Amino acid sequence: MASTWAIQAHMDQNEPLEVKIEEEKYTTRQDWDLRKNNTHSREVFRQYFRQFCYQETSGPREALSRLRELCHQWLRPETHTKEQILELLVLEQFLTILPEELQAWVQEQHPESGEEVVTVLEDLERELDEPGEQVSVHTGEQEMFLQEMVPLRKEGEPSMSLQSMKAQPKYESPELESQQEQVLDVETGNEYGNLKQEVSEEMEPHGNTSSKFENDMSKSARCGETREPEEITEEPSACSREDKQPTCDENGVSLTENSDHTEHQRICPGEESYGCDDCGKAFSQHSYLIEHQRIHTGDRPYKCEECGKAFRGRTVLIRHKIIHTGEKPYKCNECGKAFGRWSALNQHQRLHTGEKHYHCNDCGKAFSQKAGLFHHIKIHTRDKPYQCTQCNKSFSRRSILTQHQGVHTGAKPYECNECGKAFVYNSSLVSHQEIHHKEKCYQCKECGKSFSQSGLIQHQRIHTGEKPYKCDVCEKAFIQRTSLTEHQRIHTGERPYKCDKCGKAFTQRSVLTEHQRIHTGERPYKCDECGNAFRGITSLIQHQRIHTGEKPYQCDECGKAFRQRKKTSYKEILLKNHSEPQAGVNLLLSSLIPEWQSCFRKDL
């Protein structure tokens, strides 16, 4: 059972604040100083300060006294300067205003200042903006396309908000702090806290026994192990897999690449540790401590000769240089795709298994990568921070904005390998490729065209003449429900799609999109025969009939054929219904907006 922390502050402020776990007290000054100087202990005091309740005290004087003591132990004015105290307050507020999913990601990096938070978020944004890939995943007879994304949080991982942080010792690699990337993404969660408490209830907290136990447990938990206390030094690592694979010298953790051994040792501490005087973090080697201390000093001695970007560690610089050299030493055995980082390969390989560990709490939708869940959450929050400077449209992801901007520039980066046709959007390419996948297509027996299953059902109504969706006002019928919905706006006068440039409104979104190209000058539909470009697909189809000679519209009276349907004038509507003039008038009025209908009916 997890222990309950209780704080007792004495009226005499000269006496030290006592922290106890259930009935046990840290009575010696040495134990108290050790806890007081710990970074995680400061976080405990901060939480108690923020969550302090007036009802827990006997009166206002005691409440004020306890608040002063808690704040004193949190901010440490005897060791911190005014600037450092201000930075702590700003950092706390900065973390508080972040969205919950970002709070969890940032807290995992344990930032010490607001600048570190900015660095973490900027690095995360760069990783999320990397172009994705399509990975074919076979499950039974189905084939689905997944998007490669950078993971954010594992399923079941607790939300590391400001109110739920645990006071736990942790060994970290400065390289991983700089890179915001963990080779072995494991955590010291509730199992560690509960196990530590079970042992602490059976042991007297004296000497170095507690310290050694914490080091052993930190080492074990870092490698993803959950052991019983008596098995800590006897059982092999829970994460070892194959005898032939390289393993960690400290705890036998299995590694998939020889190069991972160095990576793993940076997060798996040895017996000796080196502590940072500024923040209390501990490291297994002195060189790691030196590199970490550059976070506090701001020193970045390793500079890239190509782009001038500077780094705190040599290893981080070496990894960065891969961007310029294009070297990708880590290759996927399934599809052959190569990566510059082992962690990127590890994330990519999850796509082939089809596993979806990350679930949305709002709708239950599952994702194989944390980044997929991260982007999906924006659907519920309606967050669209990325805006196009050309047309002012907003998007939830920078990558979608980049794709959209191809509409204005004319860039079509997604090309079909089968026929060479190019598209602005990757989704358009995926839809197009279904034409070539015969096993996924449904072919019309009348004309031979291929469609998806739902598309074929709608298409066949063209041949059968079936129009199941009928307008209640004018009794006009349609093949699709969406066509009926758009048509009914003629009678209601509703024009929900308005142009931001000139204020003109339209009944259909597609008509607005085509209209906006008048302002932007965009003509994305190009004729392959003569090179003429058009704003809309309908205009291109009509134009292409000049080259093909197709004339699909025929006159019922004389049999003459035409390339495009002639628009019916109001006069022709009345002439066609000359035998029933009132029916012609009603049909004509039904095509007008309600305001005009009422005006004309008064004159009739």
UniProtKB/Swiss-Prot annotation:
One of its GO terms (biological process) is regulation of transcription by RNA polymerase II. Gene3D superfamilies: Classic Zinc Finger, DNA breaking-rejoining enzymes. There is a cross-link at K20, K25, K196 (Glycyl lysine isopeptide (Lys-Gly) (interchain with G-Cter in SUMO2)). Residues 46-128 form the SCAN box domain. One of its GO terms (molecular function) is zinc ion binding. A zinc finger (C2H2-type) spans 274-296, 302-324, 330-352, 358-380, 386-408, 414-436, 442-463, 469-491, 497-519, 525-547, 553-578. This is Zinc finger and SCAN domain-containing protein 12. The gene is ZSCAN12.
